[in-house]
Design a protein with these regions (language model features):
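Short, glycine/alanine-rich hydrophobic alpha-helices that insert into or span membranes
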Residues: 64-72, 118-121
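Alpha-helical transmembrane segments of multi-pass membrane proteins
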Residues: 70-81
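Juxtamembrane "helix exit" motif at the C-terminal ends of alpha-helical transmembrane segments
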Residues: 75, 123-124
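Flexible, solvent-exposed loop segments that connect beta-strands
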Residues: 82-91, 99, 166-174
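Interfacial helix-start motif at the membrane-water boundary
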Residues: 95-117
Length: 272
């Protein structure tokens, strides 16, 4: 059963990564080969930059370590169990069940919903010449992809159980529920929107919405608080490194040489 759960989780993450890379590498139009090659080059550069900023940057690794440490305190003491019992016995009701119904699907199903949404938004943005839609879709996919390996590793390495299966204490490599993948996948699009928003109230709304998938898991007794919190924090860090990579790329002058019919083309692009 454990082996099957691990295979399912790994398969889901690799599905997201594979389709995500396809989206990232989609050429921005078909007007010339040089433009297509430029899109592929930018997509590859964005992915490698994101992974470097997440897994090699000391500042990000420090933040991740702090997040894991805080989650460990909640998970390996009675704090997680107290929060779970308090909520289930005193707060959960028919009203909260109805309110969280929209998120009452598995992480795998949520991933399979998110991918077409991102692809559809990306395509619609290109068709409508709406750069905001394109940017949101690409950043959301990049964030989902970059944090995927960390999510899988931590979920398995911590070995946490669901509330209905056991206590919150970590049992390394004994289970796959130490981090809420549902929370992670569900939070990314809202955190991305928050980071793209220019007004404080808009940021507050989107950040608030980003917590709903995790709260639904707590309400449905599918995850402990620490598992949800760590899933959300991973989503936040993933979105932050994507934003960091985008900021670093702005202002660069890109010069590219590409073959075209009857010769070569040189393209020069500066981002603002």
């Amino acid at each position: 059963m454990l082996r099957k759960a691990k295979k399912t989780m790994v398969r889901t993450v690799f599905l997201r990564i594979g389709i995500g890379l396809v989206v990232l590498l989609l050429p921005l139009g078909y007007r010339c080969v040089a433009e297509d090659n430029g899109a592929i080059s930018r997509g590859y550069e964005a992915v490698t930059t994101d992974f470097g900023n997440f897994y090699l940057d000391r500042g990000n690794l420090t933040k991740l370590g702090i997040g894991v440490g805080v989650a460990a305190v909640f998970a390996n003491t009675e704090m997680d169990q107290y929060i779970r019992d308090k909520y289930q016995n005193s707060t959960r009701s028919h009203v909260t069940d109805q309110a969280t119904n929209i998120f009452n699907i598995s992480g795998t199903e949520l991933a399979l919903i998110a991918v077409p949404v991102y692809v559809g938004t990306y395509g619609a943005g290109l068709w409508l010449h709406n750069p905001t839609m394109v940017e949101w879709a690409r950043k959301s996919v990049r964030a989902t992809v970059v944090g995927g390996p960390a999510l899988v590793f931590l979920a398995v390495a911590t070995g946490g159980d669901r509330p209905t299966d056991g206590d919150s204490h970590w049992n390394p490599f004994q289970n796959t529920h130490g981090v809420s993948g549902h929370t992670y996948i569900g939070a990314v699009p809202f955190i991305t929107a928050a980071k793209m928003s220019g007004k404080t109230y808009q940021k507050a709304i989107f950040y608030g919405l980003s917590t709903f998938p995790g709260l639904a898991r707590i309400n449905d007794d599918e995850h402990y608080f620490s598992q949800v919190a760590l899933g959300w924090f991973l989503a936040y860090l993933s979105c932050a490194v994507v934003e960091k990579g985008t900021d670093r790329q702005e202002g660069r002058v890109h010069v590219q040489l590409a073959p075209v019919p009857k010769g070569l083309a040189i393209t020069v692009q500066k981002r603002y």
